[in-house]
Amino acid sequence: MHFQEIRRAAAQGTISLPPPANSEGLEDLAVLKSCLKVIRELSGFRYAFAKDAMAETFAPLMASVEAKNELERQGLKVSLKSYFLSLILKDLENPDILLIDNYINALFNSANEAANGPITVQTVVNVVNSFPQDGINWRENPQTDEEQILLQPDTFPDSKAVQVELARWEKYSKELRDLDPLVHALLTNLYFMAISPLNRHNGRVTQILLQLSLMGQNINSPAPCLMLGRALMTNAHFGIEERLYGLRTRQWSPYLQYMLKTLSKAILLSGELLASLQRLYAQTEAYLKMIGLASHAAFLPVIFKHPACRTGEFSSIFTTRRQVASHILNDLARAGILERVEDGRDRVFYHTRLIELLESENYSFSPLPASIDPFVPLYQKGTPGR
């Protein structure tokens, strides 16, 4: 998004704030056509999402991909396999792994609020407080120790100037007037970027706020899991100078067209990722039935929700004996669905195709085996302890 350049231009007074509050001279035909295109694409994605019984499981997985993409856009290299392992070990010491977890929490902790109202200062506070280890505070506030909840819900910045900027931004966010909802969301996001009210990580927070604003009642994105990070990386060829020139002269169309194109790309990528997850689930279910393990298909939702799993966690989820849980996981490993890895005195079972799909550039996964050597499953439906 070239956040630094936009912030610098705003500081130099070359971006006129606040943005327009009505459509006069703002929404030209090209912008309106792009808005209609994006809304149609988002409607299609929302329908595909709504009719999928696994949507609640897939949404956090998709959000983990978005978090990974966004962090890699910032120059960090993170592994989702390591992240999923850290979740079951309850070991989030690695700062990059912790950042993925915080990013996902920031998206989902504010999702319900975002779906029912405008983005506000309270939303900013909720997002920032999802990253306690980063020491984020209001711009120009005294520095405090890290590992604290730095922004209280009813506390505005110490700086009067930042207070005024935030109050004006929130007022703009709440007043839709006759703007197209997408245009309003994008300009509200640009406005936040331009004032940069935080002492650090304004770019990351801006990105999350955009995800949340797209869930608003007038746009209705189904979950905060659009692939915005990757879309921004692939659309970076659109020159910042062209965008800034338009903003300097209050010609907003170049910037809006760029962001609408980015949203369109993000929705396309999100649809592809969702379709790949659906395809892997359906193929895995069909494969289990083909090899005589139809009863094991009932456990697929768990191994999709927990791509790294141990016997203890699996046993707790199904309220069953560890021996039964071990039988199920080992059957799935022998069938080639899971990969069993020794981890000290315990074993970790990885859903390798799912992790491969989430980490690949084109959301692909290795084909399931055409056949396997027959074996007698350790778990049979009706096993004592179930």
Q: Where do the PLM segments sit?
A:
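FIC/Doc superfamily catalytic core
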Residues: 1-386
